[in-house]
Design a protein with these regions (language model features):
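C-terminal motif of bacterial Sec signal peptides marking the signal peptidase cleavage site
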Residues: 13-18
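Ligand-binding clefts/hinges and TM-proximal coupling segments of bilobed small-molecule sensing domains
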Residues: 21-33, 162-178, 240-283
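Extracytoplasmic small-molecule ligand-binding "clamshell" domains
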Residues: 27-111
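Short helix-initiation/N-cap motifs at beta->coil->alpha
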Residues: 35, 87-98, 140, 170-186, ...
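Short loop->beta-strand "edge-of-pocket" segments that line small-molecule binding or catalytic clefts
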Residues: 48-52, 145-163
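Periplasmic-binding protein-like
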Residues: 54, 129-139, 198, 202-240, ...
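A ligand-binding cleft/hinge motif common to bilobed small-molecule-binding domains
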Residues: 111-120, 164-166, 183-217
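Flexible hinge/capping segments at coil-to-helix
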Residues: 126, 137-153, 233
Length: 283
């Protein structure tokens, strides 16, 4: 059983300075003040309520005890650090954001990119994933962006971070816009961030396949309520520990590699402020 360390004084300092205490050894669970911190409140309630995206392929599927995926492991990592159970609830990006804002969820993993605009509405952790806009080919003749000429394409891109097909290949054929790529009609290719595209792929299949160059870079982090930045910072420390101790790479191997065939790359080292600065507020 993990050992608990009573840190009432540390919690007072935490509230006053908005600093996260040092990450303890793996066999230690810090006991936080339930009045001063969300970490302590979660410990008092005995459960961390985590929102995960619906049908997100290797990133999240199912809910409750049936939840599986990369973000599910991240949620378990945070719950384990607090010594509590975890309750996974699935929803659309909009539903997850609303549940965070209402206090129904403590933490959520909506597929919402980190931008300077986004961090004015919610607190985010450092990125657990750096996505790239890519082309997902269903047609062996589509091997790069230039090959989209005359092809039918479905795109799912963010208004701020995405680059539309019309700019990438002005000669593309019919282009359909879909918030959910699963709702796309039959097409030759899809365009969007890889964090969304991977849900359309299956282990072992030659097609569809990610092709061509990476178009951009976008950070994705876990979300908390805007006023709960201290908790978001605490969660970032748990993600950092998972990266340095090899668990991030292990989860990549368990969930992402079977779909893409890629070996685990270096974990993301980008901080929240760096990710947001890639997409500044309009002046």
């Amino acid at each position: 059983m993990p050992r608990k360390l009573s840190l009432g004084v540390a919690a007072l300092v935490l509230a006053a300075t908005a600093c996260v205490p040092p990450v303890p050894d793996n066999d230690e669970v810090i006991e936080f003040d339930p009045v001063l911190t969300s970490m302590g409140r979660v410990q008092e309630e005995g459960v961390l309520r985590v929102g995960i995206p619906e049908d997100a392929g290797p990133f999240a599927t199912g809910s409750g005890d049936e939840a599986r995926g990369f973000t599910v492991e991240l949620g378990k990592e945070v719950a384990g650090s607090l010594g509590v159970d975890v309750d996974f609830r699935s929803g659309t990006d909009e539903e997850l954001g609303a549940m965070v804002d209402s206090g129904t969820l403590d933490l959520a993993f909506p597929l919402q990119p980190i931008t300077e605009k986004a961090i004015t509405k919610n607190a985010f952790t450092d990125p657990y994933w750096i996505a790239r806009e890519r082309v997902l080919s269903f047609d062996g003749g589509v091997e790069e962006v230039a090959d989209l000429a005359g092809k039918t394409v479905c795109q799912s891109i963010d208004d701020i971070t995405g680059i539309p097909v019309e700019r990438l290949q002005p000669d593309a054929g019919k282009v359909t816009e879909a918030a959910d790529l699963a709702a796309c009609p039959e097409v030759d290719a899809m365009v969007g961030p890889d964090i969304r595209l991977l849900a359309q792929m299956a282990p072992g299949d030659a097609l569809p396949a990610l092709v061509g160059e990476e178009i951009n870079a976008v950070g994705y982090g876990a979300m908390t309520a805007l006023e709960d930045k201290i908790f978001a910072d605490y969660v970032s420390t748990q993600f950092s520990e998972a990266r340095t101790e090899g668990r991030w790479s292990a989860w990549f191997g368990d969930f992402i590699s079977p779909v893409t065939g890629e070996t685990p790359p270096d974990p993301p080292g980008m901080h929240l402020e760096e990710a947001a600065a890639l997409y500044p507020l309009d002046e």
